[in-house]
Amino acid sequence: MQYLFQIFYRLNSGGNKLYNQEIRNCIFQGNFNTLLKDLARSPDWLNANHLTKEKVETSRFNNEERILRFFAFYYDLDRYKGKLASFLNDFMRNHKDLTENVKNEYASLLSRSLKVAMEIEKLSTSKNVFEAVLIGIAANISALETKGADVINKLYKDVEGDKNFSEEALKEGLGSLEKVQNRINAAKIIFARG
């Protein structure tokens, strides 16, 4: 499969260049790929990201990739080596044929996490911040679902004040192993206080 991805990647030189998730969509067919497309059009995802279905349809699989990143970093952060494309390819390959139960667990985790995230008054639109916050919430979902918006917003302010979310930390090299791990782990720790 890695070779197939490389072939698509190399052939992809004329016209509109395909984004990596567009290539993954072609190669890693299965119910996980279908789930990503469904979740990108779900009311929870649309509301949390201030999107319409029409906007998702024209986003060239950007939303599906963001959801893939959520699952990949949530479940396999320890396998991330700093090479995002191959990490996401591996996660899709290894999860392309989910059982119905696992598929439902994935959908439920994202939906529950988004509902808590929607309590945040001024949630960042930065995909790296949003992703870390969502994973931090997911890691503590049972406790956070019982908290009010005031607690969720206080915890989010703590995230914003953390050095891993400073303007300097979010300037460059956002996909480096150290920065990804630091952001996500900081969000998990902060939201665990809830």
Task: Write out the residue ranges for each language-model feature.
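Amphipathic alpha-helical interaction surfaces
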Residues: 73-77, 94, 116, 136-143
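C-terminal hydrophobic structural anchor segments
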Residues: 118-165
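Basic- and aromatic-enriched surface patches that contact anionic nucleotides/nucleic acids
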Residues: 1-85, 89, 145-149, 153-160, ...
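Short amphipathic alpha-helix initiation/capping segments at coil-to-helix junctions
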Residues: 60, 102-110, 122-130, 144-148, ...
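Small-residue-rich helix-loop
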Residues: 80-120, 129
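Generic detector of solvent-exposed, compositionally biased contiguous segments
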Residues: 33-44, 50-53, 101-123
